[in-house]
A protein has these predicted regions:
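Anionic-ligand binding region
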Residues: 1-6, 13-14
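Active-site-adjacent helical/loop segments in soluble small-molecule enzymes
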Residues: 12-68
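A generic structural signal for secondary-structure junctions
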Residues: 5, 9, 90-93
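Phosphate-binding loop/pocket of nucleotide- and phosphate-handling active sites
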Residues: 55-108
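Glycine-rich beta-alpha junction loops
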Residues: 4, 8, 32-34, 53-55, ...
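Generic secondary-structure boundary/loop-capping signal
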Residues: 1, 26, 45-46, 72, ...
Length: 108
């Protein structure tokens, strides 16, 4: 997800320290898992969400995070590229720099 690419580096005097102090774990999800999470939120809950905000959902759906008890994640959509979102929810390929995320129709 494009908006996850910056802002928390070691030189960032605010975000890095806050993340270091408050995070329990860090999990890496793939662009394909983000793609799928965007589809799930749209088709299951009718939520239009940007890629960066669905990483928590992607981690759960992929089995990389196994929630125990009530679990929450923040879902936003303000920085959403609607053309890209339309490609995702309609199962089309998405080009991210030099990488192509192969489209897949939801539910298949």
């Amino acid at each position: 997800a494009d908006s996850l690419g910056g802002g928390i580096g070691m030189a960032n005097r605010l975000s890095f320290a806050m993340c270091r102090d408050l995070l329990d774990d860090v999990v890496l999800v793939t662009e394909e898992e983000i793609y799928r999470a965007m589809q799930v939120l749209y088709y299951e809950d009718r939520i239009v969400a940007e890629g960066a905000c669905v990483v928590g959902i992607a981690a759960v759906l992929s089995g990389k995070v196994l929630p125990q008890g009530p679990t929450a994640t923040i879902i936003t959509g303000r920085n959403l590229d609607m053309a890209m979102f339309t490609r995702v929810v309609t199962g089309q390929d998405v080009i991210l720099g030099d990488k192509v995320i192969e489209g897949k129709t939801y539910g298949t």
